[in-house]
Structure formats: C-alpha cells, structure tokens
Amino acid sequence: MKQRLSLAQSALEKLSARRGNTWYPIFHLAPPAGWMNDPNGLIYFNGRYHAFFQHHPASAYQGPMHWGHATSTDMLHWQHELVALAPGDKYDRDGCFSGSAVDDDGVLSLIYTGHICLEDRGNDSIIREVQCLATSHDGIRFEKQGCVLTPPEGIMHFRDPKVWHEDGSWWMVIGARDASDNGQVLLYRGTSLRDWHLEHVLAHSAAGESYMWECPDFFRCGNFHWLMFSPQGMNPSGYRFRNLFQSGVLAGNWKPGSVFALKGVFEELDYGHDFYAPQSMLAEDGRRIIMAWMNMWDSPVPTRSEAWAGCLTLPREVFERDGRLCQRPVREVESLRRKCQPLSPVRLHGVQLLTENVQAAELLVTWHTVDSHAEHYGIRLGEGLRFYVDNQAGRLILWRYYPEEGLDGYRSVELPDTEYLTLRIFLDRSSVEVFVNDGEATLSSRIYPQADSRQLSLYAAHGDAILTDGTLWMLT
C-alpha cells in the first residue's frame, strides 16, 4: 500500500497547487483538493480530533475511494494529514469505502468497507463488499490488516461499519440491502476487531420503502437510543424527502443482548438541500458530536472548476428534547467570532442592508412572529439566497437561485408555533446552515454567490416584521 499512498499524496499535492478559492470554505472542513464525500472515522484520540473522509485525491470527481485525513484540537481549525488509505488490495481493489475509527488499547484502528466491482467499475448491480481493518501506532500512518468480516449469504450491498465498545464487547452496525431490495441495518458483536458474529437485523425498511440503508450509527442520547442512517430510494411525500437521498434517525430502547424497540417513525435530521451520511463521535468531555457531508448525490458541483469538491457541515452537538434529536453548533464556534455588529430592534418594512460583502459570518436574529404580518420576511444574500418566514404557507423557506450553476429551488420546514422565532445562521463562502430555535430544526445547503453578490440584508415584503434582537459576527 505504501507505493499507492505515495502516488495518491503526490497527485493530491499537484492538484492542490491549482486549487481555486472563490468558494473554498473558511471555517468548514474541505479537502485540500480533489473529491470529498462521507465523513469517516470521527474520533477523539491522543489529544486530537480526527476526521477521515471519502476522498479521491487525483481529481474533483468521484473515483476509486481513498481515505483523506485531518486533525484538530477544536473541531474547527483542521490540519490535513497524509492520505490514510488507498485501494488496490484484493479485498478493496476498487475502493476503501466508508467506516469508523476506534481506540483499541492505544492503537488507532480503522474499520472500513472493501469494495470490489465484479464487472465494470461503477456498475453496482454486481459487487462484493467486505469489512476490513487497518491500524496505526502514531495515528497518521496505517497498515492494512485485511478482511475481518464477509457478508451473510445472499447479501451483496454490505457497507459502512460503525464500531464501538460497550458492556465488555465490540459492537458493529452495518448498512445492507437484502435480497428483496429493502434497506436494513445489521448488528454484529465481536470479541475483538477481527472476530465477529451476527446478532440480528437491528432495523429494516418496510417493503418497497427504501432499497438501501447507508452509513448507520447507533448511540444513546438522552432517554433513547438513536439509529442514525441514510436511506436510499424513498419517494417524496409533500414537503418531505425532497432530496435524492435522505439522512435521519429512528428512536427506541436497546441494551446489549436485546432487540431495538422502536418508539417512533423515521425523522429527517436536516431539511436543507445538502446533508448526507452523518457520523457521530464523543468529544473529549462526553458530548455527542455529528458531522455530515454537505453535498448531495447528482447535484451540480461548480467547485470542480477550482479543482476541489465537497465539504463537511459544522460539527454539531446532538441532544434529546421532548423525544426529538436536536442539533446545535458546538460551542467552540464562538472562538471564530471577530467583528461584532449588534442589531437594534426594529419594525422592518422593506430592506435593511447589514453588510456589503460577506465571506464568513454568523447571524443571530429573533423575530416576534405574532406581530410580524409581512407576507414573507427574513434574510437574503445577494440575489441568490433567501431564508424567510412565509406567513401564508406557515413555513420557513430556504431558497437558492444560481441558474448559471444549474441550481434553483427551495427546501422548507414547518414554522414553529411560538411567539418568538430565533434563527442562528452560519454563512461560509459556499454554504449556509440554519439552526431554528436552538436546534429544533436545521437546514443546510450549498450556495455559490459571485463576488459582487454577497450583500447581506434583512427584509420584509408586503407588510411589517418585528426584529426584537440580533447580532452579526464576522468569522475567521
């Protein structure tokens, strides 16, 4: 593998030399160049946070999957490390697909899916997927240990292992597609990272509901266990499931040796255009943190012209509130704040310019919804992004319009039935993330404003809106 890693690193360095920065993020993790998708192997290990990710170092297009690697002390300022894994062995010939990382008695261990195309590359109707192990004593350079788990009889799609240690055993959840083309998550138990046996199917889709459940994660938070996964093949329903693929959670009760007793239905984790394959880790202080890929399959990728593609969301702390899994930005984001601009309370009618040129910012605003009678009101960035309250529809709308990049359309969530609406909005060069009422809902989307279209404004149309409080920070 050493030669393949060297070639991958060399290709990445050559591509990095011509990377453009028009839309390259200031405070989100993105590849130094090349392609990025799923976050992998999120872990706090030996005093640093590690984020691995699906990566093609040779181009800004999806290719044979490698594992990129970055480390941080605060989950915000990332240092890119050497490419961690490169495909090419008999068990991962066509890709080192997604997986997780654990601390095995001081050894940083990666458990990942080895992907093999049995016919043409890219034809996923005839593939073989197995689970593999790689280990490192310094946390940077990894040695492959080979295949440690093969799929059950009759299962071809078998990927994205998430591993943890509990009750004296190793546990693993894996996404799968059964013989009837229904998604499911399999639960395994191990005496070591090399010795596994199947416990049972932890959860599965209803017949015809979705054909594959990718990137599962399983953890306790608050009063419930949460199965987090990314189903493929769900049909749109009203305002729901509008992206090509979804990501969300099932809540229930579980303990080692028991079944997962569901307590509700599948709930999406994010309602924007771009959120997929979230993975969790425990922070140094025990907070449960998730990060996701902030893109969507089959969406336009304008940054390819700048030799890079893909980024991750802000790290988010998840917590349970009234039986729902909520998200808020990790408190470390406050360290990014620089220039502070308080916003005075105002009865807004028309447009109020906040700043002429936003590269990276956090906007915190509170609206008095009961006395805000405008047809719609909120924020806008240039001519291409609006996030607003639609009083007639009773919804919060995230609308983006970049026709030159092939992007147009909106996503939305129901307007909370509260007297006050608090929005915490993070803008980076090519992304927006909105947190509604301290994590009650989130919306994440990629945006592509031109240099002359970064004016940030508040507005109210066809009536007044009452802003009760607000602050704008520039971020670095």
Curated annotation (Swiss-Prot):
Record EC number: 3.2.1.26
Cellular component GO terms, alphabetical: cytoplasm
Active-site residues (renumbered): 38
Residues annotated as binding substrate: 35-38, 54, 97-98, 159-160, 214, 297
GO BP, one annotated term: carbohydrate metabolic process
Catalysed reactions, semicolon-separated: Hydrolysis of terminal non-reducing beta-D-fructofuranoside residues in beta-D-fructofuranosides
Gene3D superfamilies: Exo-inulinase, domain 1 (2.60.120.560), Glycosyl hydrolase domain, family 43 (2.115.10.20)
Database matches in CDD domains: GH32_FFase (cd08996)
Main EC class the enzyme belongs to: hydrolase
GO MF, one annotated term: beta-fructofuranosidase activity
UniProt keyword annotation of Hydrolase present: yes
Entry's transmembrane regions: none
Sorted UniProt keywords: Glycosidase, Hydrolase, Plasmid
Annotated SMART domains: Glyco_32
Cysteine disulfide links: none
Database matches in SUPFAM superfamilies: Arabinanase/levansucrase/invertase (SSF75005), Concanavalin A-like lectins/glucanases (SSF49899)
NCBIfam families assigned to the protein according to its UniProt record, in alphabetical order: scrB_fam
Family of this protein: Belongs to the glycosyl hydrolase 32 family.
Task performed by this protein: May prevent the potential hasard of excessive sucrose accumulation.
Quaternary structure annotation from Swiss-Prot or TrEMBL: Homodimer.
Name of the protein this chain belongs to: Raffinose invertase
Species annotation: Escherichia coli
Gene transcribed to yield this protein: rafD
